[in-house]
Design a protein with these regions (language model features):
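Extracytoplasmic/periplasmic solute-binding protein
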Residues: 139-147, 152, 177-230
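Short, solvent-exposed loop/beta-turn-alpha elements that line the ligand-binding surface or hinge
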Residues: 113-127, 197, 214-240, 288-289, ...
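Extracytoplasmic/periplasmic substrate-recognition and gating elements
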Residues: 56, 60, 140, 164, ...
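Extracytoplasmic "Venus flytrap"/periplasmic binding protein-like
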Residues: 57-127, 162-171, 267, 275, ...
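Hinge/lid segment of periplasmic solute-binding proteins
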Residues: 99-152, 205-206, 295-297, 362
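Short, low-complexity disordered leader/linker segments with a strong preference
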Residues: 1-37, 60, 118, 424-432
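Glycine-centered hinge/linker elements that transmit conformational signals in sensory
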Residues: 181-182, 225-257
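Long, aromatic- and glycine/proline-rich binding clefts that accommodate carbohydrate-like moieties
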Residues: 126-132, 297-298, 346-396, 400, ...
């Protein structure tokens, strides 16, 4: 999930020496007053608002339960969870990222198959559930109840497009470069990049774009071969995609300070920039600033018209396997599958991962329509389905490709070297 991953993966590599206190391991009666503790690492994003409002609604239905939502620092969140699991002093429920993150930490999580009624699980988008299950197969049972469906996505200013004479949203590299030329001539920054909006530090996060470059290069059924190494990171197709990406800056499609610009979100909100690549967690911010001028587009990082979109349940809540309040924790997870919960999540500007629900935000609904009406293939977030060490290396190397500081081959070779250094159990021909 989004831009915290590289720091979190690094911090979680070593357990803290001592565990955090005041967790869910304290004793408590299931019939008397119960305090249910939830840890989250959302910071100030819309997800935090949604979770707090879910907690309030749950408390209203369960008068004996107090839900204590604890905001933990994002930079060492998973190290805190691991340390607390050792001493069993952690939370009852915890925000957990999906994909390989879930499988990495499943030793202290509860598989929810048979714990939550099948009818409740059936209300959840099955594509969301599978990415929280062993072998990414929902039949094996999820470890996470997803909070929302997330998109890595492009946003564009319709008024800027109209003024510049861009009559159609670009769908491939050639059309994108042509649109950039018109937007620049009209006085706009075509695409804004930078490190603004990152919860942790001033770092450019390349995996939104990298996901779309790999969508342009490979079918979703072949993405596992990036994990296994059957498709080398240094493949000609990958190098060609990164070479095109680097042209965005060299051809004047972006700001010159792509790695260090801190107000890139402000450039888009103010109308100075015509496009940016971001995610659903900022949709409400953009619609509040730009109203009907803002719309979503699929980043067209492909030689032929792009046919895939990143549609992925990036996080949700897991129950720890040492909680002493499992009855109440499971009730909360069941509540997350209801239509009432979906309304709360939608009200926070997010997309509920519940079957049959929609979103009141028109830009979020546009993203859903890419799959449901335009029949684009839904892809996961690439940084959730390749190894954390490879993600870390890519986060260090890939930004310099866009900046023109290093070649695509150099960055991809570093990623390939990192992959080759992993034990064979971490790069098999199937997911763990």
């Amino acid at each position: 999930m989004r831009h915290w991953k590289v720091l979190a993966a690094t911090a979680a590599a070593a357990l803290l020496a001592t565990a955090c206190s005041s967790g869910g391991g304290s004793s408590g009666s299931t019939s008397g007053p119960v305090t249910l503790t939830i840890w989250e690492n959302y910071g100030t994003e819309q997800n935090a608002t949604a979770l707090k409002n879910l907690a309030k609604a749950f408390e209203a239905q369960h008068k004996n339960v107090t839900v204590n939502v604890v905001s933990q620092p994002a930079d060492n969140y998973f190290a805190l969870l691991q340390a607390a699991a050792v001493s069993k002093t952690g939370p009852d429920l915890a925000v957990m990222w999906t994909g390989l993150f879930t499988l990495q930490y499943k030793e202290f999580l509860t598989n929810l198959k048979g714990k939550i009624p099948a009818a409740d699980l059936a209300r959840i988008d099955p594509d969301a559930l599978k990415w929280t299950s062993d072998q990414f197969n929902a039949a094996n049972g999820p470890y996470v109840i997803p909070l929302e469906n997330q998109f890595y996505i492009g946003f564009y200013n319709k008024a800027a497009f109209a003024k510049a004479g861009v009559t159609a949203v670009p769908t491939d590299w050639t059309q994108l470069f042509a649109a950039c030329k018109k937007l620049k001539a009209a006085g706009y920054m075509p695409l804004t990049y930078g490190n603004g909006g990152q919860p942790l530090g001033a770092e450019f996060y390349p995996w939104y774009d990298m996901s779309y470059m790999m969508i342009g290069a490979h079918a979703v059924t072949n993405w596992q071969q990036l994990y296994s190494g059957q498709i080398p990171w240094t493949s000609a197709a990958n190098q060609a995609q990164l070479a095109q990406w680097a042209k965005l800056k060299s051809n004047g499609c972006t700001n010159s300070d792509v790695l260090t610009k801190t107000n890139n979100l402000g450039d888009f909100e103010s109308g100075k920039a015509a496009m940016m690549v971001d995610g659903t967690w900022d949709t409400q911010k953009f619609t509040s600033a730009l109203g009907s001028k803002v719309a979503a587009f699929v980043p067209p990082f492909s030689d032929s018209p792009i046919k895939g979109v990143v549609d992925f349940a990036g996080d949700g809540l897991s129950m720890t396997n040492y909680t002493q309040h499992s009855a109440q924790a499971l009730q909360f997870l069941e509540f997350m599958t209801t239509s009432q919960a979906a309304k709360i999540i939608n009200a926070a500007g997010l997309i509920p991962a519940i079957n049959g629900t929609s979103t009141s935000n028109p830009v979020n609904q546009q993203m859903l329509n890419f799959v449901s009406q335009d029949h684009m293939t839904a892809y996961p977030m690439l940084d959730n389905v390749v190894q954390g060490n490879v993600v870390n290396t890519g986060s260090k190397e890939l930004p310099s490709v866009l900046n023109g500081s290093i070649s695509p081959k150099s960055a991809l070779s570093s990623m390939q070297t990192t992959l080759g250094q992993l034990p064979s159990t971490q790069r098999g021909t199937s997911y763990p």
